[in-house]
């Protein structure tokens, strides 16, 4: 799933994880999300010049997933998805949600993931990772018209 994230988001990522998989996958996957979210926050930096918002609706065969991101610095996570099996390969399906929650809070992003159509659980999960990648790529893209942080906080409204 992380390979799909890096390829479709056009990100360079190398991950080496040592976990307690002999117990279960919870800590390993959650900690990977925390570390990735922290690394993203650090890589994004002061956010000057980036678009801040990104979204993607991505089809994967019968599945359709929406992902929307706001790199506001205020973590918030909305999940509207259900899996019909307990596992996808060696991964607990409940850990997909925990992974994205961990990234969201560690990075300080507002993250919404919603399954619009589903079927095959692997396709749904893969579409989640790829739509997240494309939304994050859009949100972190530079725009020469944005000369500072894209925000209206601290601005006074002038009524004419």
How should each PLM-predicted stretch be described?
Residues 12, 46-53, 110-114, 139-151:
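Flexible, glycine/charged-enriched surface loops at secondary-structure junctions
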Residues 18-26, 116-122:
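A short glycine/serine-rich beta->alpha loop
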Residues 158-160:
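Conserved small/polar residues in nucleotide/adenosyl-binding loops
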Residues 74-78, 88-143:
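Mixed-charge, glycine-accented linear interaction segment located at domain edges/termini
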Residues 3-5, 48-107:
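Intrinsic, low-complexity N-terminal interaction/targeting segments
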Residues 30-51:
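Ordered, amphipathic secondary-structure segments that act as subunit-interaction surfaces
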Residues 2-19, 26-29:
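Polyanion/phosphate-binding surface patch
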């Amino acid at each position: 799933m992380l390979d799909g994230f890096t390829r479709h988001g056009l990100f360079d990522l190398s991950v080496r994880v040592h976990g307690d998989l002999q117990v279960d996958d919870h800590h390993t996957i959650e900690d990977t999300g925390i570390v990735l979210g922290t690394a993203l926050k650090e890589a994004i930096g002061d956010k000057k010049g980036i678009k801040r918002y990104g979204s993607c609706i991505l089809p994967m065969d019968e599945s359709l997933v929406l992902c929307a991101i706001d790199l506001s610095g205020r973590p918030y996570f909305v999940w509207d998805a259900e899996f019909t099996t307990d596992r996808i390969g060696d991964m607990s399906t409940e850990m997909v949600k925990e992974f994205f929650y961990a990234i969201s809070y560690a990075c300080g992003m507002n993250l919404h993931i919603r399954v619009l159509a589903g079927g095959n659980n692997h396709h749904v999960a893969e579409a989640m990772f790829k739509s997240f990648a494309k939304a994050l790529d859009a949100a972190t893209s530079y725009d020469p018209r944005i000369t500072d942080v894209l925000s209206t906080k601290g601005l006074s409204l002038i009524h004419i």
